Structures are given as C-alpha cells and as structure tokens.
Amino acid sequence: MTERDREANEYVLGTHRVELLRLGFQHQVWAPFTSSLWQRAGFGPGQRILDLGCGPGYASFDLAHLVGDAGEVLAVDMSQRFVDHVQEQAECRGISNLRAEVQDVERLDVAAGSLDGAFARWVLCFTSDPAAVVAGAALALRPGGRLAIMDYCNYRGLIVAPHSPEIDTVISATFLSVTRRGGNMDVGQDIPAMMRSCGLEVQSVQPIVCAAQPGSALWRWPETFFLGYLTTLLEMELITEDEADGFRRVWT
C-alpha cells in the first residue's frame, strides 16, 4: 500500500483488504464473548443500538440481526473506507436496519436520549480521550439504556510458556507504540470510573482470561496482529530487525 492509498484517519494496521480479512477473523474468534456481553447488556429485538468504532461492520451486522426489523443499528467509524464497506455489505446482504456514518467517536453526534444501547470493542484503547467517548455515548442513551464495552485491562499480561524474551520485547513495544499515538492499552482499568462520572451505574465487570494452544484460532488471533505490526514497530524504531526476526522465529 502506498502513502497515497492511506486514509487521513488510518487504523493501526490500515484499512486495506488484508486488514479487512484480519478483522473478520478476529470477530469470529471473539463472537461468543461478544454475544455474551450483549446478552448481559439486554440488547434485543426492537432496540436502537450504537456500534462505536464499527470498523468494517462485522459486529454491526450481528447487531442488526439481533435487533431485527423493528430495531436499528447506527454504526460509526472514523474511516470512510470502512463506512463505505459497511454500507455496501449491508446492501448486498439485504440488511435495511443498519446505517453507517463517518464520525469521530470522541465527538459523537447522536441525539441525546435516542439509544437503547451502545457498544464498543477495542476502541477506547486507541483513542486519546476515552472519557469523551464514554460521555458521548452516555448522553445518547435513554433512561435505562446500556453501554457495553470490551477492552484491554492488562495488555502486558499476555505471556507465553515457556517464557520468551523475544515475545516480551514485542508486546512491550506494542504497548509503547499505542501510548505514543495517544492511546492506552490498559484503559479497561479506568472505564468503570469514566462511566460513573457520567452518571452511569456500573452493573457488571467481567474479566476474560484465556489460554491458547499453538495452531488454535485463539493463538492465531494475536499472531495475525503481531506479524503484521512488526513493520510499524520497526518504522517507529521501537524494535530492531534482529528483535523482529527473533519474534518471528519464536512465535512461528
């Protein structure tokens, strides 16, 4: 991908076709956890739900089926390319209760009290002002509406056994790279306080801890991210070529 192909509001790994496929695989891996979150939030038929930072819309499509024809999903993202993809796929799939818009989630433009629910997955960790995202979503919720968030809480808690310094180096560099971009890969620790400051009642906090075997889908999920992100870490001079090669050798 050339610089000319890049969007002004680029994702960490871009918005090109390879990233579409990676995000699709990611959604498949995490769909059971996501569906469980929606169930606990009470999302269901006839509701109006906001998908914050929808990306290419994989969760948005599932939400559209969940709320049914009597409901509606508003999917917002900073990427015009991803929003176009959502709209095209919705038309191809005959999904008429899904609307996608280009919006900055830190400056949400949704009518106050117009939503039954809002959802964000791995969005707040990449924003420079996650409290503004939470506040905007809270304002858009009707009384009794629910905000459901899935995000990282202890990113450097990702470990492999036996211990690998090569993998530790890349995990730490990834954490630092997001910090330099204004994000926080441990944002989950702060989300409950953000919610309370907006007048929301925190009803549930559920940690997700998983163990994966090499070759499994859950193992391949971080693999697809890290192997693609090594180039960015090299460009940011957060790792060396030898460290990148060491990660590839150990992980694969």
Task: Set out the residue ranges of the language-model regions.
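A short acidic, Gly/Pro-enriched loop at the edge of an enzyme's catalytic core
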Residues: L108-G117
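Conserved alpha-helix/loop element of class I SAM-dependent methyltransferases that forms part
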Residues: Q28-Q47, D62
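N-terminal, positively charged/glycine-rich alpha-helical extensions of SAM-dependent methyltransferases
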Residues: M1-L20
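A short SAM/SAH-binding and catalytic strip from SAM-dependent methyltransferases
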Residues: D116-P130
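Conserved catalytic/acceptor-binding region of the Class I
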Residues: A148-S216
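C-terminal helical/coil "lid" or tail adjacent to the Rossmann-like core of SAM-dependent
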Residues: V12, V18-E19, W30, Q203-T252
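Class I SAM-dependent methyltransferase SAM/SAH-binding core
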Residues: L50-L52, P56-R107
